[in-house]
Structures are given as C-alpha cells and as structure tokens.
Amino acid sequence: MLLIWAVQGWSALAKARKLKNPFPATPAALAAGIEVYTNHCRRCHGQYGDGRGEKAAELSVAPGDFTNASKMNRLTDGELYWQTTYGRRPMPAFAHKLSDEQRWKVVDYIRTFAASKR
C-alpha cells in the first residue's frame, strides 16, 4: 500500500502537512497498524518497510523505503496520511478502502521502521 513515494520526492498538499495524527502510537494503535500494513502494504513495501516487497520488482516506481530515518523524519504524519489516502500510481488510493482511523494507525506503524534504525 502506502504508502509512499513520499520518501522519494512525492509532495503532499500544504494543508496536509499540517494535519496531526489523532491516534498516539500506543501498543493498541501499533497492533492495528501492523494489521493494516500486513494486509495492504507489505506486498510492495516489504516485511521490513524497506521497499523490497514481493511485488516491488513489478512496479514502474520503487515503493518508498520507510527505514530511511533521514527521509522519514522530514515527512509529517499528515503527509504520510495524505499519501496513503490519495495514492499515486502505481500505489492505490486507500480513501475508500480503509477508514481514517486505519490510515492514521498505519502511519504510526510505518514510523517504527525508521525508528528501529536509529
């Protein structure tokens, strides 16, 4: 899914950058984020969030690498949420597939990939 070429220069709308995640990264939120990621993101973004999922080689654009702390730290939660919501080929939009809550919680979870590299 996701998420994101954000880490590769995909810019969100200015107002999206200011959005705040209403779901703190609690153990319950992260567990919900893991479920969403596993079901919708992992095939492209990979088990470890490194953009090396089983479908990655088939895509015209490499999936975002969420393990790159430098790039991930430059993105706001609002930008990641926006990119997940609206997508950009080949990544699908998830506005009608996932609830707002699910999209925010997957943002919480993908943040853990870069955090584990510090």
Q: What is the meaning of each model-derived region?
A:
Residues 1-4:
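Bacterial N-terminal signal peptides
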